[in-house]
């Protein structure tokens, strides 16, 4: 990581260097997901050998990471609030019989970034623009009129590539503030004997989530200091032409950020609105790593 802080001019230069606006036409709303072709999806299905299913998600419940202590200001996100609308007790008492059916029902109230999730292309803006040059005012109190995450519902399928950077560096977890470099990513792929291909979904393990789980506390995880992608890995994203990138940290990129005051999450500024790449955050990778 460079000792010099990334400034506004660096951000302008990066926006110009990595811009994909118009690459898939003026009306595109899914960005780098376009790198994955139907042929790629068919090829990916042929890689299945055991049929074992591994979830990479945390449970959506009160034990999640949001709301834990952090040295940075809160983003206002909370863990899911679960409310029962009908229960087995209601059924047993007979109060449901007037409806002619005994059943349980419930509801969940939560921020959409409360746990394991994908950042949509309407999430982060570069100045007053989102992906493909759409005006940020397309996101209103009624929701995202452009680049909503729902646009990806029939697109997010492809070959997954797991890069265990923590294991490559011979540690249980990368240190907070460690910026993962291009060399780390390519070195991990080489050690694992993986050839990265256009349209891949790359999942990177830092070990941070497991560190928190082992300690029995999420304090410092949501919005705190963390290992993550250094700003230089924008080259990796560009050169590999990957479809999407995910990690086991709260915000993917290294924290504290490499930028000067007033530029929060600079890697996000470029990957989402400029390059059109959705990213996955808070992925639970322990079972996959084992």
Residue spans of the language-model regions?
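Active-/binding-site microenvironments in catalytic and ligand-binding cores
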Residues: 1-290
């Amino acid at each position: 990581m460079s000792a010099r802080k990334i400034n506004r001019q660096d951000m302008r230069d990066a926006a110009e260097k990595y811009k994909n606006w118009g690459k898939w036409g003026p009306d595109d709303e899914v960005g780098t997901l376009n790198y994955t072709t139907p042929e790629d999806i068919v090829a990916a299905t042929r890689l299945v050998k055991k049929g074992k299913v591994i979830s990479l998600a945390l449970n959506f419940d009160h034990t999640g990471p949001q709301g834990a202590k952090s040295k940075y200001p809160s983003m206002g996100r909370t863990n899911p609030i679960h409310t029962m609308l009908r229960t087995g007790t209601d059924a047993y008492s007979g109060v449901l019989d007037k409806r002619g059916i005994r059943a349980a029902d419930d509801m969940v109230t939560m921020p959409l970034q409360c746990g394991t999730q994908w950042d949509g292309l309407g999430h982060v803006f570069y100045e007053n623009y989102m992906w493909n040059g759409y005006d940020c005012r397309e996101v209103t109190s009624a929701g995202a009129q452009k680049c909503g995450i729902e646009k990806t519902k029939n697109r997010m399928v492809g070959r997954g590539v797991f890069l265990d950077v923590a294991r490559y560096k011979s540690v249980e977890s990368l240190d907070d503030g460690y910026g993962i470099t291009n060399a780390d990513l390519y070195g991990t792929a080489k050690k694992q004997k993986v050839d990265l291909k256009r349209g891949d979904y790359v999942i990177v393990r830092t070990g941070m989530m497991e560190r928190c789980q082992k300690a029995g506390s999420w304090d410092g995880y949501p919005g705190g200091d963390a290992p993550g992608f250094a700003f230089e890995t924008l080259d990796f994203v560009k050169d590999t032409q990957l479809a999407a990138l995910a990690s086991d940290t709260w915000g993917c990129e290294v924290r504290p950020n490499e930028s000067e005051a007033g530029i929060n999450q600079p890697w996000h500024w470029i990957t989402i609105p400029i390059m059109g790449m959705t990213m996955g955050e808070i992925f639970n990778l322990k079972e996959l790593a084992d």
